[in-house]
Each structure stands twice: as structure tokens, then as C-alpha cells.
Amino acid sequence: MSRIGKLPITIPENVDINYNDSEITVKGKFGTLQTQIPTVIKITESDNILTVGLSEQTRSVRALHGLYRTLINNMVIGVSEQFEIILELKGVGYRAAVQNNEIILNLGYSHPVNIKIPNIISVEVVQNTTINLKSCDKELLGLFAANIRAWRQPEPYKGKGILYKGEQIIRKAGKSAK
């Protein structure tokens, strides 16, 4: 039995969960999330505690146990508390702004970079160099943050680029003179 899969999921009071054999829907104050689940995953609910079980014990099914328990737990946390990722822009002239449901990045290219913001994600720019991303969907939030970061990944010589908050860049020494 999976160590993560056997852990119970506590459901907050303001979260509503509906499920059948192939789908689970989680509603809360920050939104509604829905995902498909395999029919071999069995969900039971009692006293605001959700447990994820298996209908058969084959190797491939046991591999899904912890995965779907974590996905459901992330949905519950997301609709009740939201997830947040903070990106920092480091570099001369690197700036960010939000305009018309797009984030506009000046990253040293000859043109500004425009990235469309998904509906489920809220973006706030603080002091032109810090981007706060919030969403109830952890997977989509991580993908969007990685998409923004891919435009200027941090480089090891000067430390310029787009960094996650708290990320440490391992610096390299430049060329040494003879």
C-alpha cells in the first residue's frame, strides 16, 4: 500500500466534493476544479474525511494510488486556500506589466514579450520586477510560471533572468586572465 495514498484527506467546511466512478469535482470559495479518475480508484467519504483506495492490487494500479490521492488533495487545498508562486526579474531593464489580460515582459529582447493570462490565474505585478501568480489549480499555475520563466532562465555568470522567489543561482567564475 502506498504511504502517500493511504493518508486521509481532510475536507474543510467550505469545500463541496462530488464524485462518481470516473470523475471528481471539487467546489470552494476560490473556484471549481474537475478531473478524470480511473475506475480502479475508489473514493470513500465519512465525517469530512476522504480516503482513496484501490479496487485491485496490480502493480500498475498501485502506482496510481499516491498520485490520485495527491491530485485530489491539491484540488481541495486549491479551492479553499489557493496556491501562489512569486517570480522575480533580475537584470538591467527587466520589467513586467499587466495589460488587457496579458502580461508584458521587457527582458532585453528587441521586442516586448506578451503572454496571455489563463482565466483561472490572477496576476499582480509589484514594483515592475516581482510577479505574483495565484490560482486554485496547482498544475496550471506551475505550467504558467514555467512558461514565463522560460523566456529568460537565470544564467550563472551574472545571475540575470527570471527566478522563483527564494531560488539560489549557483554562480560561476568568469574567464581568468593570463
Curated annotation (Swiss-Prot):
Pfam families: Ribosomal_L6. It comes from the Eukaryota. Keywords: Chloroplast, Plastid, Ribonucleoprotein, Ribosomal protein, RNA-binding, rRNA-binding. Gene3D superfamilies: Ribosomal protein L6, alpha-beta domain. InterPro entries: Ribosomal_uL6-like, Ribosomal_uL6-like_a/b-dom_sf, Ribosomal_uL6_a/b-dom, Ribosomal_uL6_bac-type, Ribosomal_uL6_CS. GO terms for cellular component: chloroplast; ribonucleoprotein complex; ribosome. Binds 23S rRNA. HAMAP family: Ribosomal_uL6_B. Belongs to the universal ribosomal protein uL6 family. This is Large ribosomal subunit protein uL6c. It comes from Phaeodactylum tricornutum (strain CCAP 1055/1). The gene is rpl6.
